[in-house]
Amino acid sequence: MRHFERIATQLKDSHALGQVVGQMQGGLTVPEESRLAARQKILALQDEVAKLPPVEIVPQHHFSKGLYAREIFIPKGTIVVGKIHKYESLNILSQGDITIFTEFGARRVRAPYTVVSPPLTKRVGYAHEDTVWTTVHATDETDLEKLEAELICPTFPDLLTDDEILALKGGD
C-alpha cells in the first residue's frame, strides 16, 4: 500500500476533465450549489480521474516534535484528488499555481500561499504550473499506516453522527 496515495492524472488525457476543471475555475461557491452537490461533483471527478492513466505523486514525509508534514510535487497539467482529512490542517503552497476545489468552492492560488483547512475537507487540485504543496498536521505519530488511520476519513462524513462530527471539530 502506498501511504496517502492520491488519484492523479494529466489533464490532457480527457476532454471531460477539462470541462470539470473549467467549472472549478469558474469559482463554484457554496450559495450557488449545496455542499452535498459539491461533494457529489468531487466524487464524480474522482471516479473519472481513476479511469485514466495515473501520475505517481510521491509524498515526502517530514517529522518534528508534535508535527507531521507531507510534501508533494504536482507536475504542471496534473489533476490530483486528495483524501478526506479528519482534522483541521495547515496547507502551504511553496511553489506553483494551482486551482483548488473543495465543497466550499474553488480558488486559484499562487505561491507563496498558506491556509488552514477546516476538518473533513477533501480537495481536488489542478496544477497550472509545477506545484509544491505541503500539509501539516499536529500529531506525535510517526508510523505512516497509523498516521493514515488517525488523519484520514475513508468517506465523506455523511454517515457520522452529529456528536462524532462535533468531536472531530474539537467541540464538546
Model-derived regions: residue spans:
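A short, N-terminal "cap"/entry segment at the start of jelly-roll beta-barrel domains
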Residues: 1-71, 165-172
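Glycine- and acidic-residue-biased ligand/ion/polar-headgroup-sensing regions
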Residues: 85-104
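Double-stranded beta-helix
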Residues: 128-172
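Conserved short histidine dyad/triad with adjacent acidic residue
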Residues: 67-85
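A cytosolic small-molecule/anion-sensing beta-strand core signal
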Residues: 94-95, 111, 129
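Short acidic-glycine-tyrosine-enriched beta hairpin
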Residues: 73, 102-123
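A generic "binding-loop/recognition-motif" signal
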Residues: 78, 86-87, 105, 121, ...
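Short beta-strand His + acidic residue motifs that chelate non-heme Fe in jelly-roll/DSBH
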Residues: 80-82, 100-101, 117-118, 122-128, ...
